[in-house]
Amino acid sequence: MEPSNDVALDIIVTNVVSVFRTRCHLNLRTIGLEGTNVIYKPEVGKVLMKLRKPRITASIWSSGKIICTGATSEEEAKLGARRLARCLQKMGFKVRFSDFKVVNVLAVCSMPFQIRLIEFTKNNRPIASYEPELHPAASYRIKNLRSTVQVFSTGNITVTGPNVQSVASAVEEIYPLLFECRKTLS
């Protein structure tokens, strides 16, 4: 049986991590006192700020570097980052939204079959590893896409990569390898 080309796999993006700079120094104490939905952590030297729409959490450092997590698309990450910059501007900081980039994307996908992990790692030995004592998934690294795929025996996979395109390409690349190691129903 050949892996059919018309199989539609739903790739669900669950987390997008992005970074941007404000190009100005930020007083964390002021943000902690005046901001809404903030947690000031002076021992770490950062402020956590949460937005409700889009639902993101931002780590704000006094240097002006901000890391946003929790978005479910690259567009939502950019919208949330711009909204965060606007909140800081309203507090009186001379914020300029710059150097925005998506640094990490986490997605999940479910294969329509179960997978024999030991056979999968034996077939793809140099780039696949499986340590059942440490973690229930096999790890498969795709260097040219800078992506890592975690393969579970149930057929569920989690993919981390630098952007949504590389995550989708990683799923396309690994599907034939998983198909040949699928469990047959008895």
Curated annotation (Swiss-Prot):
Compartments it resides in: Cytoplasm; Nucleus
InterPro entries to which the protein is assigned, alphabetical: TBP, TBP-like, TBP_dom_sf
Entries under Gene3D superfamilies matching the protein: TATA-Binding Protein
UniProt keyword 4Fe-4S present: no
GO terms (BP aspect): DNA-templated transcription initiation; embryo development ending in birth or egg hatching; transcription by RNA polymerase II
Entry-linked Pfam families: TBP (PF00352)
Major localization class: cytoplasm
Gene Ontology CC terms, in alphabetical order: cytoplasm; nucleus
Keywords: Cytoplasm, Developmental protein, DNA-binding, Nucleus, Transcription, Transcription regulation
GO molecular-function terms, A-Z: DNA binding; general transcription initiation factor activity
Function: Part of a specialized transcription system that mediates the transcription of most ribosomal proteins through the 5'-TCT-3' motif which is a core promoter element at these genes. Seems to also mediate the transcription of NF1. Does not bind the TATA box. Members of the TBP family are differentially required to regulate transcription and development during early embryogenesis.
Protein family (similarity comment): Belongs to the TBP family.
Name of the protein in its database record: TATA box-binding protein-like 1
